[in-house]
Swiss-Prot record:
GO terms for molecular function: structural constituent of ribosome. This is Large ribosomal subunit protein bL28. InterPro entries: Ribosomal_bL28 (IPR026569), Ribosomal_bL28/bL31-like_sf (IPR034704), Ribosomal_bL28_bact-type (IPR001383), Ribosomal_bL28_sf (IPR037147). The keyword Ion transport does not apply. GO terms for biological process: translation.
Length: 75
């Protein structure tokens, strides 16, 4: 599975490592992806998502039903 958040769409960023002498080498900044189950009360079932921790905070704030509805509207 690719490291992309299914809620926010966040993915890795590319940047530089900087040594003491300021030499630049490429590196990846990975996001904190968690595989998490969310309970949907309306359907009485769990849904499994690959979500960043920022996406989890968004779900806690808005509610899983609202977020799922918004994702389905984008498709």
């Amino acid at each position: 599975m690719s490291r992309i958040c299914q809620i926010t769409g966040k993915k890795r960023m590319i940047g530089n490592n900087r040594s003491h002498a300021l030499n630049a080498t490429k590196r990846k900044f990975l996001i904190n992806i968690q595989y998490h189950r969310f309970w949907i009360a309306d359907e009485k079932r769990f849904i499994k998502l690959h979500v960043s921790t920022n996406g989890m905070r968004y779900i806690d704030k808005k509610g899983i039903e609202t977020v799922i509805r918004k994702i389905n509207m984008k498709k």
